[in-house]
């Protein structure tokens, strides 16, 4: 049998001889045009006196159907090849910003694998698909790592960004050299140097900072410092007492002394159970008991949560306590 497929048709063999993987778009067209296909006549003799021979419409309709299918396939191929490369649109540029191709202008696209860098007093606003906006501030460098329906991922090489995202949780990510900021539906700012040291501040919603099995969940009005050596620190609220913030920084740096923890416990308010909840995972078991007692004194203990379970870091129990506490934050 002669092969009448055109050159380059190997990728679409289903169209020509229905072999190979089914092309869903071609199969849909076939189903739509099925009523028009040529059907051989039934071998039933017509009455001789009134027999009339209709025009051979079947083959003509079949030919027309083939033309329609070919035209549709051509349109599909053209549309596929003409689809724009994935990327984020540049909504606005204030001041000087550059890419690998030169000066960055409004209306350009930041492609996957591409980067942009802002100069002094510059700012760039980038649209994150249909999910929100990222503002890249002065003296910053970012690159786009992924732009798919499952993941939108930005790398912050250094500098500062502000994200306003309305996506479902765990769809938008920002990487630094030290952590990954996982959006849980929120607005936040993130600063980082080239090594990954920096600070996250959440305006609303929540962000999870993740690195090497460590997770710090930061709600609205929360702040969390990031260390290149230790990853995400312990979150605290921006309006906490100065002595709590200072002692917490010492604990995150490795000072787990009795006196340092005392300062944090004494300075804690009911709202600061955010900080104490995270400290449960960072201190030894003896100190964990002290943190537990202070949390109970500040906010009580919800049903289903026990001292023994907390000291053993029972995951489901701690999640339940978090859910009860966050209502007051």
Q: Which role does the model predict for each range below?
A:
Residues 34, 38, 74-115, 119-120, ...:
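Flexible, surface-exposed loop/linker segments and immediately adjacent secondary-structure boundaries
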Residues 2-6, 10, 56-59, 100-101, ...:
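Acidic, Pro/Ser/Gly/Ala-rich intrinsically disordered segments
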Residues 1-38:
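Short, charge-enriched, intrinsically disordered boundary segments that mark the beginning
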Residues 289-329:
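C-terminal non-catalytic accessory extensions
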Residues 7-9, 270, 314-315:
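Intrinsically disordered, low-complexity regions enriched in Ser/Pro/Gly/Gln/His and often acidic
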Residues 28-37, 44-49, 56-87:
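Single-pass transmembrane signal-anchor helices and their membrane-water interface zones
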Residues 2, 49-51:
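Short loop/turn segments at strand-loop or loop-helix junctions that form parts
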């Amino acid at each position: 049998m002669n092969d009448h497929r055109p050159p380059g048709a190997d990728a679409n063999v289903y169209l020509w001889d229905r072999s190979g993987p089914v092309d869903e778009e071609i199969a849909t067209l076939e189903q739509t045009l099925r009523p028009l296909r040529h059907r051989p006549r039934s071998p039933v003799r017509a009455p001789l006196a009134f027999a009339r021979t209709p025009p051979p419409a079947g083959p003509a309709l079949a030919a027309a159907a083939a033309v329609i299918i070919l035209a549709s396939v051509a349109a599909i191929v053209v549309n596929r090849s003409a689809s724009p490369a994935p990327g984020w649109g540049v909504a606005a540029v204030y001041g000087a910003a550059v890419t690998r191709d030169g000066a960055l202008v409004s209306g350009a696209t930041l492609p996957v694998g591409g980067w942009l860098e802002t100069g002094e007093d510059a700012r760039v606003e980038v649209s994150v698909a249909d999910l929100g906006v990222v503002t890249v501030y002065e003296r910053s460098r970012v690159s786009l790592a992924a732009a798919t329906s499952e993941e939108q991922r930005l790398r912050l090489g250094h500098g500062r960004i502000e994200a306003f995202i309305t996506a479902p949780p765990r769809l938008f990510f920002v990487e630094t050299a030290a952590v990954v900021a996982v959006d849980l539906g929120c607005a936040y700012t993130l600063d980082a140097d080239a090594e990954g040291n920096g600070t996250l501040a959440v305006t609303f919603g929540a962000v999870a900072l993740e690195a090497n099995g460590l997770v710090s969940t930061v709600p609205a009005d929360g702040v969390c410092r990031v260390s290149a050596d230790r990853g995400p620190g312990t979150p605290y609220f921006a309006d906490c007492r100065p002595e709590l913030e200072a002692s917490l920084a010492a604990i995150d740096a490795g000072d787990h002394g009795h006196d340092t923890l005392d300062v944090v416990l004494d300075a804690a308010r009911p709202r600061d159970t955010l900080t104490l909840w995270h400290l449960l995972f960072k201190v030894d078991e003896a100190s964990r008991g002290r943190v537990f007692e202070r949390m109970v004194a500040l906010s009580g203990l919800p049903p289903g949560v026990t001292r023994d379970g907390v000291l053993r870091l029972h995951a489901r129990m701690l999640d339940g306590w978090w859910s009860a506490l966050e209502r007051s934050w």
